[in-house]
Amino acid sequence: MAHEKESPLDRAVRAAVNGGCIVYPTETFYALGAKIGNAEALERIIGIKGRPGSKPLPVIIGNMAQLAQVADENARAWPGLKCARELMECFWPGPLSIVLPVRKALPPQLSDAQGLVSVRLTPHPAAREICLRAKTPLVATSANVSGKAPVSDVRFLSPTIRAGVDAVFEGEPRPAGGLASTVVKPVADQEVVVCRAGALPVETLARQGFRLIETP
């Protein structure tokens, strides 16, 4: 009966804490998410979306302290480490996903064959609050069936997605829509591979002194 008095945000947090899958707003689009350490929930997300299992799931964090839960901060030999820190200082929180070495023992659905995971510090107040109250980073893949357009208005959420999750938090402010987050992989001092152009213009990266390598 106590659950009847829960706010929509409370329900989303409880679902995430209990290992469920949720839909929630981010600064770009609505996201489909779960705790990063729950392999079963991550597999559910892949199934709900019809997403290729070989495609890693991106992650958001609610504050910088949560970065250590998803990224291997001891990867001292990684040549992109200094550049990654500079990117974070310049552009986080914001719609910039940075590809980083994944922390050991996390589910394989999060990382690619090189052991890298895409992470961003979200500025969206509701997404941040869910991460902080659930005490974990969250998967943040777009809440759409694979191959379909992402949604910034929950009214257009696919029935397949809605039926497959444990909670939908509509939240305010609504996602901005437009473009997904920009994704970059730091490879050397002030040198980044642009994996996906997006909401943070690559020209902004260049103006801050980062050398850009476009992917083919």
What are these regions (language model features)?
Residues M1-P216:
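Active-site-adjacent structural elements in enzyme catalytic cores
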